[in-house]
Every structure is written in C-alpha cells, then in structure tokens.
Amino acid sequence: MSPVSGDTYKLLTVNSAFMPFIWKAGIPLQETSKHKHKKNGFTGQLGFVMAAAGSAVGVGNLWRFPYLAAKDGGGLFILIYLILTFTFGFTLLTSDIAIGRKTGKNSINAYQEMRPKWKFLGILTFLVPVLIMTYYAVIGGWITRYIAVYLTGQGQAAAQDSFFTDFITSPGQSALYAVLFMLFTAWIVFNGVEKGIEKYSRVLMPIMLVMIIAIAIFAMTLKHTDADGVTRTGLQGLAVYLTPSFKGLTLRRLLQILLDAMSQIFFSLSVSMGIMITYGSYVKKDVDINASVHQIEFFDTGVALLAGMMIIPTIFVFEGVEGMSAGPGLMFVSLPKVFASMPHLGRIAGLAFFIMAAFAALTSCVSVLETITANCMEIFHTKRKRTTIVLTVLYAVISVVIALGYSIFYVELPLPNGSIGQILDLMDYISNSFMMPFISMLSAILIGWVVGPDWVIEEVEFGGRKFPLRKLYAVMIRYIVPVIMFVLFLQSTGILSL
C-alpha cells in the first residue's frame, strides 16, 4: 500500500494552541479603536478574481478531478460537475464572499457580527486553515522536489516505482523541501495583500493557465505503440475523457457520482475554510460580487477541465485505461513514468508540469496562510510582518514533524471512513472530510434560517448591482445545501456507506 492515501493531495493536528489565547482573560474578538488598523485590500475586481482563483485552483484540480472523471463515467461526471458547480458551488462561494465584504472582518469576527451566539462557527471555520497549514507546505515540498529532479535531468530515476516512497521516507530531504516551500509562501504573505498576494497572483495565474493549455495541446499530439503492438493516441484518450459512459450505471452508482462531484466542488472552491471570507473582506464595495463569483468558477472549472485534457490522454497513450485508476499516486508515480516514456521531450514536459503544479500549490498555500495571519492580526492586534514571521517559524516546525510522519514518526492510523493513513492523512481527514462539510451545513442554516437569505442578497446587490440568480440562491441556501452537506458529512465520516 502506498504511504499516501485519501485526499492527501488536496492542498489542502488541530493546532489548538491558538484557542486558549482567544478565550483567556476575555480577549475581545472585535477590534478596539485603540488597536484598529487600516485594512488593506485588493485594488479592484481583477486582482480579487486572480487571488481567489489562485486559492481555488490547487493540486486537487490537477489529479483529483481527472481521476474522478476517469472513475465516474467521463463525460457523465463532467456534466454533473458543471451543473453542480453553477448551483451548489455558486451558492457557497457567494455566501462566503458576501459575508466577508459585508462585515469587513475575517471568519471569527464575521460570524460573531452576523449573530453573537454563532461566533463558535467562526472559530470552527478558523480551525480549518489552521489544520490544513500543518501539511500544505509538505505537499508543496514534494512538488518542489520533482522540479529539482527534472531540472537536474533525473527524470528516469523519478520513473522508478520506489522513487517517491524513497523520497518521502528520507527524513532530511522531505523536511528540507517542506521548509523551503513554507518560506516561499511566507514571503508572499509577508508583503501584504496588494504588494504580495495580488501582485504574485496576477503573474502566476496567467502563466499557469498558459502552461496547462500548452501541455493539454501537447497531450493531444501524443502517439504510442506498446509491446503488444497496440497503438493509442492522445485524441483517443480525449474521447475516453469526454464521452459519457453509462456502463454499469445504477441508482446507487449515480448517487456516488453525485457525491464525488459535490465533494470535488466543495474542496476545490476553498469554501467553508474562512479563505473566501477573508478575501471577501478585502473586496471594495464597487466590485460586482455576482460577476466575480462566476469568473472564479469559470477559471477554477476551466483549469480542472484542462487538467483532464492534459492528464487523461497522456496516461491513456502510454498506460491504457488501467493507468487512469492510480488515484493519488497519479501525480507523483504514474506521470513520471509517462514522462520517461517520451523520447526527447520527457524532461521538458515533466519540468513544465511540476512548475505548473507548484504555481497551483503556492497560490493555494498562500491563501491558507493569509487567512490564519489575518485572523491572528485581528485577535492579537499585531502587525502583519511580525505575525507572519511567528506563524512561519511555527508552521515550519510543524511541517517538519508532518514530513517526518513517513519516516521517524511513521504510524498507521485507522480513519473513520475505513482507510488507513499517516499523520498527514489524519490532518487532511479532520479538516477536509469532517470539519468542512459540517461547517458548510451550519453556515447554510445560519444564512438560510437565522439571518435570512436577504442578508447576503442585499450585499450582492449593493450599489444597484444585478443578481439574476437571487431566487435560486435563496432556495439553495435554505433547502438544498444543508441537506447535501449533511449527506456528504455522513458519507465522508463513514456513517453512510454506498
């Protein structure tokens, strides 16, 4: 069994050390006039959309979406995914951004301002990035290692079955690359919203998009004849990816595909993590929230679809249909084998892919650290640079511990959903599979039944803006989202088995 399992690669231990300081001695959750600082923000809609899309587009778009598409009927999964993205995903994303902008605060204080008795939901939301940050840099470090591999011409070595396992079980290497990635992330957050997050997102996101389009086009041109004389082409792989497959489809199977699509949307859009609330608090009042949400959705979904066009044809050409069932190991095990099979261009293709993956991981990791930083600045009334430095040191140490979870601190932990994982997988399970669906369900109840959908709708329509889907939003937030989240929570925790 691979030492990496589950949703490990969704960039994506509860560091409860923060919480005693929040409650101890009655430290206020709201800024006092004495400590209130001018809140920086995005310069405009483009900067916000690029930063938010950078958060949404992560490593999960690059491996999990293609894997689920291959597993769940190709075009059938894609169709269901698109429908849910522009209904279910639209509702959650709109809610988070509107909450952030209307309150002008980060998750802890935002929920408290909505309803004082619901501040516990803000604290739960804050804990999600606190947990995710414990392992995010570790995964980013893995990607950074593969960039170094292809830069130094070691692509053939990376194609060996044991290469990835040997790397993550090597204490020195895995810890070093995790710390390096943590430092890259911290530098961007250290420079603030406009000069850090927005500036780098405006550069990295377009470059990443161009690279993924180029690699996807390259994948279409591939052709390979295996040892049995069977010739497969990239265009045939594209047909496998896009053609709906109804083979073996039952009602139970359809429900599983629906849940897979919903979980991918849920994790991909960075909702119910406090990230979009934090980014929303940086958005100016003249920015059109409705238009921004659709732009973020189009960008995120477009990258996911392009990732499928890039990965599935490539794997199909060299390994056939069977190669697409690799799951989490696809990115670090299967693809290096494919790159090694490419005459002359394998090194360039491998380097381009992992640089693109590093951009996706970096922009997502930045959003996680920024959310923690922004909340800590409000809680402890500290300056950005000092807060960032303290958090960087703290998470660098924690990242080393998590990285060593495959060597010195190796353990096999049974998870409630029936899988076996290591320390990193446990952190990923608690944050992604347990807390995020639960938080999203509670947030929908708060908006739909406590403050009312109009609380969000009024913010979206601020300044006379149009909100054509307001009726859909009201129905989704009150009735559909709470039920979907409850079912997803039961499934992800192993209570509901399909």
Q: What is each PLM-predicted segment?
A:
Residues 68-72, 98, 113-114, 120-129, ...:
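Membrane-water interface regions at transmembrane-helix termini and the short interhelical loops
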Residues 36-39, 68-72, 105-124, 137-196, ...:
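Inter-helical loop and helix-membrane interface segments of multi-pass membrane transporters/permeases
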Residues 121-124, 373, 380-392, 428-485:
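C-terminal membrane-solvent junction of multi-pass transporters and transport-like membrane proteins
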Residues 44-82, 275, 291-294, 298-301:
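Transmembrane helix-boundary motif of multi-pass solute transporters/channels
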Residues 41, 47, 55, 171-176, ...:
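Loop-to-transmembrane helix boundary motifs in multi-pass membrane proteins
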Residues 15-63, 92-97, 101-113, 119-120, ...:
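Membrane-interface "cap" regions at the ends of multi-pass membrane proteins
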Residues 30-42, 202-362, 366, 386-387:
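Membrane-embedded translocation segments of transport machinery
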